Curated annotation (Swiss-Prot):
This is DNA ligase. NAD(+) binds at residues 41-45, 90-91, 130, 153, 190, 307, 331. Zn(2+) binds at residues 425, 428, 443, 449. SUPFAM superfamilies: BRCT domain, DNA ligase/mRNA capping enzyme, catalytic domain, Nucleic acid-binding proteins, RuvA domain 2-like. Residues 610-691 form the BRCT domain. It comes from Burkholderia pseudomallei (strain K96243).
Amino acid sequence: MARSPVEPPASQPAKRAAWLRAELERANYAYYVLDQPDLPDAEYDRLFVELQRIEAEHPDLVTPDSPTQRVGGEAASGFTPVVHDKPMLSLNNGFADEDVIAFDKRVADGLDKATDLAGTVTEPVEYACELKFDGLAISLRYENGRFVQASTRGDGTTGEDVTENIRTIRAIPLTLKGKRIPRMLDVRGEVLMFKRDFARLNERQRAAGQREFANPRNAAAGSLRQLDSKITASRPLSFFAYGIGVLDGADMPDTHSGLLDWYETLGLPVNRERAVVRGAAGLLAFFHSVGERRESLPYDIDGVVYKVNRRDEQDRLGFVSRAPRFALAHKFPAQEALTKLIAIDVQVGRTGAITPVARLEPVFVGGATVTNATLHNEDEVRRKDIRIGDTVIVRRAGDVIPEVVSAVLDRRPADAQEFVMPTECPECGSRIERLPDEAIARCTGGLFCPAQRKQALWHFAQRRALDIDGLGEKIIDQLVEQNLVRTPADLFNLGFSTLVGLDRFAEKSARNLIDSLEKAKHTTLARFIYALGIRHVGESTAKDLAKHFGSLDPIMDAPIDALLEVNDVGPIVAESIHQFFAEEHNRTVIEQLRARGKVTWPEGPPAPRAPQGVLAGKTVVLTGTLPTLTREAAKEMLEAAGAKVAGSVSKKTDYVVAGADAGSKLAKAEELGIPVLDEAGMHTLLEGHAR
């Protein structure tokens, strides 16, 4: 990016402002992308202040991509969810050289690379190697070269809009440069804080009498999630681009290394510590080379990342679960320290898992002060022979989650105490049970336990469960934290005045949620069973239970032998179901749902008897929008009553159930003389099956 040859005089404010913007952006590019600063800080500040003055005097000269627009705007009330057009996937991890060798072998096998008789790869795969930054993954969207949106990774599918905060980061260009500008480009990368900037930030915090940050990652995370972008603007954040989401209007580079080279031509900051290597030997050489220089790098990293370089080979390998087969994160060994174990408590997770947690004398390890560490499970405590009072080795696994590695036996005091797993949940008093062949003990009060409350409510409301539209995690958080909802049954007591009192919950949202709760009262037995959140009981098992028993009470009272007769239900699943219904707290909530909530479903006779009633063997077609039921809920109710639900109308169709905005299916039914029912008429047919 060349320096502007002619400096316009102050008497020409439009030209002067344009020149100042170009000069400041050129200086940013030289500093952050080229790492070759050529403008002293004082001179940069002088030009910046001059541009601010001109734009204040001539507001019509302000442009969206002006460097002055990075300083932050009004405080936001919250972060808006953003659904990623292309998921931001996580990577599989490797911790040892053997993991890398195995990864290379899997990749070579997947690409049908040549091997010798001993199985050694003789046609090495080409990889792109990069650093794994210890920061926050984000996605930047550019449209026609202009920055328009930034979002966090979130759960990989949905993140949060942090556009105004990202706009304040000088390393990120607001306008792309170069000739190959795409119509749309999602840049994936990492927001981080350099070590020198972190040290200066903590100096400022100390001088202001404010709390210091534990490490650069925490500082970056806290800065990026500020509701007031002015605070973010005051924090020294940086950025490196390393991946891509959506691309439209330009050709995708053939290689990953080519992508990063292209990014540099667009003015995006890309880390120079990268290489293209061949085979496992090349991967390990890069890893160990970086490891030797890790402490001298100007930023924190927790490993390196390997990616198959050729794009066509990446496509051939594809993905498994939520991670690509063509990439691996190779983590550095975690850092360790010695401290004293003061006590062992148990923690109840969102799914009821009981985890022993070590309470420690504070120790600084892996860049953070650690006072608690996981002991994983009861078996691990026994295997490692860890006792209260021991001196223990603490490790930050993956540099994030502290764990107790082992006890230092020659320092064990005479009064060291063995850990005993409690028999009752510390949160709700329900029984703690451990299934055969499982390492994790669990609280059995799934519908009642406060620690599991949010997870139970969230699962209960899922689309494949009772499908309560509008009951998202943030609303559940408020309902639980304000003690408005303790169990799923309490949802059906929520009133309009209660809902509109929630933070950022308008009248329309309240009415929609109440309508959704009303619709949720009419469900199917299979959906209801699935909604209970019984461990090991997914949609398929819930349907098998409903089909086998026909109604809920026989399932609740079934002994393990009877449960084992259900299709695909083995000993572990049967024991889990039996334990769930044996817990009186769960039975109480179920009765409240049936009585207070009036949740109903069509019931049928137990298998193997054929479905009875007017819909047995009948073919029904659904069309339009029903007043209280979703299409999926209506379909399941009809199928539970023995009907076959078809997607198109023909002479073999017995009934058409039509709602609002019914289209060609309704017209064809009328043409063929097929009986047309509304939702009320459908319920009339189902009366012989309803509770």
